[in-house]
Each structure stands twice: as structure tokens, then as C-alpha cells.
Amino acid sequence: MTENNEHLALWGGRFTSGPSPELARLSKSTQFDWRLADDDIAGSRAHARALGRAGLLTADELQRMEDALDTLQRHVDDGSFAPIEDDEDEATALERGLIDIAGDELGGKLRAGRSRNDQIACLIRMWLRRHSRVIAGLLLDLVNALIEQSEKAGRTVMPGRTHMQHAQPVLLAHQLMAHAWPLIRDVQRLIDWDKRINASPYGSGALAGNTLGLDPEAVARELGFSRVTDNSIDGTAARDLVAEFAFVAAMTGVDISRLSEEIIIWNTQEFAFVKLDDGYSTGSSIMPQKKNPDIAELARGKSGRLIGDLTGLLATLKGLPTAYARDLQEDKEAVFDQVDTLEVLLPAFTGMVRTMHFDGDRLEEEAPTGFALATDIAEWLVKNGVPFRHAHELSGACVKLAEGRGQELWDLTDNDFIETFAAFLPADKAPGVREVLSSHGSVDSRNGKGGTAYGRVREQIADAKAEVEELKLFPASTSDGSAYKAPGTF
């Protein structure tokens, strides 16, 4: 393709000179917005057809325009066309490319009836809708990996913790599923967000709409949107939906980071709950023995990056008056970075989760330690008629007695229980507390909805699988149920 290197600007006329070199360098955005080129060309096709329907392009002109756009798309795809130094943004570059193919007279007609304001507002929506589906699919892969590990864990019991201290025994599967549900909600958030962003700003113009008789609804349909934005000012200026996506991305990072923190702790020599596959671990340049959980550490670190992208975007938006301002150029890098981060992070993280191996014997050994069955003693006492306030004190007395001897609760003698419970239970009944002094007994007793009993965990795994089956339709569909296709293929 022959490049037209003559400077092309999308504005001028009232200016006596072009932009200063300093302004040109500051304004330049092709280094990050070129990734919108495919969406821009798809939007240009739809806009050209709208111009044709409005009688602003003849049938012959429309055909030549579409042919030129197809040629431009091929040149973008094969890399023979790319931005040059003088191109301010991807829209400027693509108009230059179109004029180079179609000629100045025909190529110059495409800009009629649209502004970069409504154009870029639409492109970022198209791009985010597409990539939200990619991210949703990757998140569901991670959820499935957690479900697989939960099924594999079976009845294995581990120490549940609050404040990082031993609290109560729980099934390993229950602990893992506690991380699956937030990730499911992240996908649900993307689906809910898509309902709001599923509106095309095309036709809003700079801010007041267009006067050329164009059909925004037809353009919206061609670009995969179910409707047109209700207010042209809002259509060009609103970035709350971009910020909402940024929040979902940041929340996803936080959810992954919390799981990462547990994996990092579980993987230490002191805990030794889990071993990571060699393919998802790294070594040390100086210490031959090291096997490091780098994926979990990188995930934990990148969550801060995702939060920073959201915070920066919100700070940019907070002081803007309504209608377009150039500050809004700053919306794109934040979400581009988030998408790039998640689309690289999630496959690696899923691989780590899917291949990690838990030491069931170690988990079972640790599950009842640290007086983790103290609550079970208190609840047993309640079932035997002791008010909970007193039951709590009596259980605490058992802990104090065992702790003073360097023992665990199950090491206490029958006489210890008889003496401790003497004010509330007859001597022949007190030793019956031993029936709850096992981690499996503790787990099995917690059989309410959402509890850690084996049957309830199997129930929630089945519920999660059903939810995933429903949610996995989103990565392949638009919110109105039609197939979601690549730009330009609607």
C-alpha cells in the first residue's frame, strides 16, 4: 500500500497554522488507541451505509467506499498500514488510509454526520463489550478449576481460620468453593454491566445530535447494540460505564489476590498444605532449593495495578463538566491495561490452580488443633440445656485447662469434663461431650444451607456447576441473546 505521508488533520479552517510540535506530541494517542482500528473500520462501514440510506452517498459511491474500507482492513490486518508520526490518533490514521485508497473526494465524505466524540465513545464500548466476554470466559475457566479441585478434595478436612487463627474445622472443598462464588459474581457483574453499555452513541455528533437524516438505530444494530443512547450529550460524555468496567476488573483482581494470599501461605514449609506444579513455579538464581509461587505473587501484585487503573480513571472523571472534554482521552489506557493484565494473568492462574496438589494427611492432622473444636463443646452444652453464655464460659475453661497442660481438648479426661461441667450437668452425662471432639464430627454437624457438611458442599458444587452452565452463554452472545461476533461481521 502506498502511504500518504502528507499531514492530515480532522480539524482546521479557522486556524492560521498547524499545531506546535509540543502540542502534537502531547495530543498523540496512536501508541495506545490503535487497538481500536478494527472497531473503527466496522463503525465506518455502518456509518457509510447510513450515509447511503440518507442519500448522501450514491449506490456507486457506497460500493466504492465499502470496497476501500475492506482494503484498508486487509492492510491493517497484514501490517502494511499503520500510524505514522503525524497521525494524532487512530481515527486520523484510518482516514488518511481511506483517502489514500478511495481518493480525497470520496474518502472525505465519510466524516459527514459524525464527530470523533460519538465515534470514540462508541468504539470504546464495542471494544470493552468484546473483551468482557473474553475475560468472562477466562474467569469461568478458573471457577471450573476450583470446582474440580473441590470435587477431588472429597471429605478432606482442614483448619478453618478467622483472624488467621485456628477457628473451626471445614472441608477443603468448602474453603475452595468460598473462592469460586466471588469469581462467579464477577462474571455476573460483567453481564449486568453489559446491559447498560449495550447502547450505541453513534448519531450523537459532537454533543447535540445530527441533522443529516442518518439512522442511528440501524447503525446500532449493525454494530451489535440493541438500542441507541437516550441523550446525545450523555452519549458522547458519559464514561461511568467505562469506570464500572474498571471496577469489575479491579474487584476481580482483589478476588484473585485473596486466593493468591492463601495459596502463598499454604505453600510455605511451615504450613505445607499444598504443592505447586513445577510448570507453574519458579526457582532462584542463587538458592538451588527454592520453588517459588510466582504466579500467585504476581496475581497479588497485579491486583494493586488494577485498583490503580480504576482510581486514576475516577480521579480524571470527577472534575469534568458534562459534555466532551479532551480529558476523556485518558479513559482508554486504564481499561486497556486492565484487559491486558487479566487476559494474561487468568490463564496462568487457572493452570496453577488446576495442577496444585493438596496434602490431605497434613490438612486432616491440623484441622482439629489449636482448640478448633471449642465451639463444638459450647454447642453440645447448649443442646444439653446449658444457656449459651455459660456454655461459652465452660468451653473456654476447657481450653484454658488443656492449654495449661500443653494438651488438646480431646486429651482432657472424663473427670476433667465432669468437674468443669459440674454446676450444669450430672456426672454421668458430662463425658458425652467426646462425641463432638473430632473434626469430621464437627464438619458433619454443620448441615444447614451453606454449611460445611459434606452433603451441603456437594449441593453447592452442583449449584455452582449449574450457574457456570448458564453464565458461559455470555462469552458467546450479546446481552440480547444474538451471537456476538468480531467487529465488522454483524
Curated annotation (Swiss-Prot):
It is found in: Cytoplasm. Signal peptide: none annotated. SUPFAM superfamilies: L-aspartase-like. Disulfide bonds: none annotated. Pathway: Amino-acid biosynthesis; L-arginine biosynthesis; L-arginine from L-ornithine and carbamoyl phosphate: step 3/3. PROSITE patterns: FUMARATE_LYASES. It comes from the Bacteria. This is Argininosuccinate lyase. The gene is argH.
